[in-house]
């Protein structure tokens, strides 16, 4: 392993998909930048980016019903879905750029075409899905979305969810074939590998950030400790990005920036049921998302997914949420307690007071027996057999608690960038939709922290080579949207309709 440099233009804390993506983008825009990546664990992509720590959905809001809430008048609001949908286009364009230039030799090393479906049962849910399809299919971003209430048609799309189902049960499904299953762990390794082939980049595993302070010259002094030897080194950095997943809050607090005052985290653990039986997994080729129970949080949306990891096809069902005080899967049970500061106690108490539905949901999930969990799977896959499935622990998700002038504190389920006043430090907090929008988040970091470089004489030309639709609203420009998706589908070997 290379020696830790004394100075670096950029320090990336965490070696997951977020840091790997931002590092890739910055080195594409300015190859002369010195970039140092720091990771506590032995390798990159070992926390939430690791393949079995997430669902591997290329989240484009094709099938996730929590992005399309129903209004009181019965209509469906697709605003959030369109945002997520076009944010995923940024990731597709970045990946296509890297494949085209040879930085990623084969897209099938991390990406596989996989239809995205929504599936519901019951009269009210069928009516909702019918209205949702009507509104989404009318928009160019969802061109080609199919809808059916016919069990034979749905069985042709996904036989396991129909076989053994009670005849006459009202059911409905939508399908869009342009979806994807993504191995974000494999992608993280590919991104870090191509970064390591470039001059000016170094990654240092088994090194933990223990202190962060501003120097007299305005640069950041990042103190890291070798977890094996306890030896400490300090790096002087012009810009610091904390993309450490659940560990980002700790880095934000260490930075001492006033913009981070009041922020806290609410950790949620996850459990999957996993099936590796070839005769079963080969018969299901889709990511099938259902409808969460009324009043439950977005993280509770159940889904039955195709996963392709290391060339092996498996099925995943879940998630079942739980509570753990860890902020990282490889973290400490003291993480939550250590994160409590005088400035964030009141926002945390306000969330405990106001978000009782989340507490009720988590208590219910924790108290669920294995029989209850398996019954939920059989709601999707009626003929599922217990001996074919095993439990798997997912990655930790740390939801954002932030100060709010009206409610003192609020709980948010998205992601948020918290930056210093001079934009020399930024931390990425939150959990969803996460990895799918890593490239979009990288664009947000550029706009927030490097806006002076986004000029025709600066990075703009290279940025538009990498992301050809940069500056174009794909929600409004149907031709640009279709052209981009046709081009990236061809390069990435995805289906296009």
Swiss-Prot record:
EC number: 1.1.5.4
Enzyme category, top tier: oxidoreductase
Assigned protein family: Belongs to the MQO family.
Any one GO molecular function term: L-malate dehydrogenase (quinone) activity
GO biological process: tricarboxylic acid cycle
This protein's name: Probable malate:quinone oxidoreductase
PANTHER family: L-2-HYDROXYGLUTARATE DEHYDROGENASE, MITOCHONDRIAL
UniProt xrefs under InterPro entries: FAD/NAD-bd_sf, MQO
Keywords assigned by UniProt, alphabetized: FAD, Flavoprotein, Oxidoreductase, Tricarboxylic acid cycle
Catalytic reaction equation(s): (S)-malate + a quinone = a quinol + oxaloacetate
Superkingdom to which the source organism belongs: Bacteria
Known cofactor(s): FAD
Transmembrane portions of the chain: none
Keyword flag Flavoprotein: yes
Source organism of this protein record: Rhodopseudomonas palustris (strain ATCC BAA-98 / CGA009)
Pathway entry: Carbohydrate metabolism; tricarboxylic acid cycle; oxaloacetate from (S)-malate (quinone route): step 1/1
